[in-house]
Regions:
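Cytosolic juxtamembrane N-terminal segment immediately preceding the first transmembrane helix
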Residues: 1-45, 55-58
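Extracytoplasmic gate region of multi-pass secondary transporters
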Residues: 41-42, 244-301, 363-370, 374, ...
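Extracellular/periplasmic helix-loop-helix junction of adjacent transmembrane segments
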Residues: 44-77
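Conserved MFS/SLC helix-loop-helix module at the cytosolic interface between two early adjacent transmembrane helices
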Residues: 77-118
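C-terminal ends and interior cores of transmembrane alpha-helices
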Residues: 100-115, 327-345
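Cytoplasmic helix-loop-helix junction between adjacent transmembrane helices
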Residues: 121-164
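Glycine-rich segments within core transmembrane alpha-helices of 12-TM secondary carriers
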Residues: 135, 151-179, 185-197, 292-301, ...
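Central mid-sequence intracellular linker of multi-pass
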Residues: 154, 159, 178-245, 251, ...
Length: 475
């Protein structure tokens, strides 16, 4: 079935919940546990370096910045190979390896800190980053296989929202774990939960509807028809030259880089800002630091639902829908960070509100540039995500280091103001580039002899006997 055929196709939509929803739930929790292990150091390091503790590590802020960024050293290295491996071997095995290895390293990290100090901690974090490099490419591959176009906005948002809930829960729980059982409990809890998820996903996860042991023929037909395919997808060689010379793809790269600069600046430095500038104790620090990510988690569902409605009712084209939500997701935080820069001294409520808005409204990116990889070339979505994530996470390394360079006195609000202004500027200009040059038109290099046509939602009718269903039954 060619993409060039613009006629709307009648699709049989199964009633009730299906296996695609179970896969969505599994990926949601996998993303949640992966992100708890990604960000646990941001809170743990506050307690690990607290002089009031009987045992603490006297690491200066520059060393702490190195530790916080070390995860991304490993994370960046394997991004492009991860995209190619996900496309070749499927997302399930890579996602499982990522979470299970991260869980083991999380369990070992407290011992590493006691034996080898910050150098061994960095080694553990680099190894965690190396294996988490598979998370986004494998998830994008799985999403491209499982999510029907008419449900893609909400279901994809649900999967990636697991990461934000993971951050929120981690920040919320870390303070209680550290004050009750010590900072080591943070890593032990993460490792145990991640290991339990890995076993569950090995049993119930699947790379595609065609490979699931539990799915009905009706649901397979629905997903296949919605995505414009029947049977297993062909695997074409990646057209690297065409990919890297595609201006719409570069618009996605730029947006992803801008997103990572602002997001990871706040994710890694917010607990320190709360502690040193707002004078918030560790337990309250965790609660207040979690609020922005809880708001992002909740708003992601609102924006995912709105995206599906807008696309289904054709109020905007798919291209303009992506641009609209990406603008909310990047320019909204830019405005909030400028507001945060002028926070009145000692006004903790104002600062928390601005941080909550800055992170919460960033949920727009999930139905913005994050879906354009799949729009442009569903056959190569894992490869595209690997490339953009590789480049964007170089930014994730640089951003905390730049913050460490700018902020010499952690208690001085004027130095943090510079950090927030830089992040706001990056948000603004990268989204401007995305708005000017991005598109959701499927690219001709996605499949041989295909024509560019913007992806359109097919009309969904009540279940009835279809030619595709008859064809399936004859197999």
């Amino acid at each position: 079935m060619g993409v060039a055929d613009e006629k709307e196709i009648e699709i049989v939509r199964p009633k009730g919940l299906g296996v695609r929803h179970a896969q969505t739930a599994l990926l949601f929790f996998g993303m949640l546990f992966a992100f708890t292990m990604r960000v646990n150091m941001s809170m743990a390091i506050v307690d690990m370096t607290d002089e009031r503790n009987e045992v603490y590590f006297a690491w200066p802020h520059s060393v702490q910045a190195v530790i916080l960024s070390s995860f991304f050293w490993g994370y960046v290295i394997l991004q492009i190979p991860a995209g190619m491996l996900a496309r070749r071997f499927g997302g399930k095995v890579l996602f499982t390896i990522s979470v299970s290895v991260n869980s083991l390293l999380s369990l070992l990290l407290p011992v590493g800190a006691a034996w080898g100090g910050w150098r061994l901690v960095c080694t553990c974090r680099v190894l965690q980053g190396l294996t988490q490099a598979f998370i986004y490419p494998s998830t994008h591959h799985l999403v491209s296989q499982w999510m029907p176009l008419q449900e893609k906005g909400f279901l994809t948002t649900l999967v990636y929202a697991g990461g934000q809930l993971g951050i929120a829960l981690q920040l919320l729980a870390s303070g209680f774990l550290a004050t009750s059982w010590g900072w080591q409990a943070i890593f032990y809890a993460n490792g145990t939960l991640g290991a339990l998820w890995s076993v569950t996903y090995i049993i119930f996860g699947a790379d595609s509807p065609e490979r699931s042991r539990f799915i009905s023929k009706e649901e397979v037909l629905y997903i296949q028809t919605s995505l414009g395919r029947v049977g297993e997808q062909k695997k074409y060689p990646a057209p690297w030259l065409k990919i890297m010379t595609s201006l719409p793809f570069w618009a996605v790269i730029v947006a992803h880089c801008g997103q990572n600069w602002g997001f990871f600046t706040l994710m890694t430095e917010m607990p320190t800002y709360m502690s040193k500038v707002l004078n918030v104790n560790l337990k309250n620090n965790g609660i207040l630091s979690s609020l922005p990510y809880l708001s992002m988690y909740l708003l992601s569902f609102v924006m995912g639902y709105m995206t599906d409605v807008i696309v289904r009712k054709k109020w905007l084209s798919v291209t303009n829908t992506r641009k609209f939500f990406n603008t909310i997701g990047l320019w909204g935080p830019a405005i909030a960070l400028i507001g945060l820069s002028y926070c009145p001294e000692g006004n903790m409520v104002y600062a928390v509100v601005m941080l909550t808005v800055a992170v919460g409204i960033n949920a727009g990116q999930y139905t913005g540039y994050m879906l354009v990889h799949i729009d442009l070339a569903p056959n190569f979505s894992a490869c595209l995500m690997g490339i953009t994530n590789f480049l964007a996470n170089i930014i994730s390394i640089i951003a905390p280091l730049v913050c460490g360079f700018i902020v010499q006195d952690e208690t001085e609000p004027s130095e943090w103001r510079k950090v927030f202004f830089v992040a706001a500027g990056v948000y603004f200009f990268t989204n401007l580039f995305f708005v000017l040059f991005s598109t959701s038109v499927r690219q001709p290099w996605n499949e041989p002899k295909e024509t560019d046509v913007e992806m359109k939602p097919a009309e969904i009718k009540e279940p009835e006997k279809s030619k595709l269903e008859a064809k399936w039954s004859r197999r």
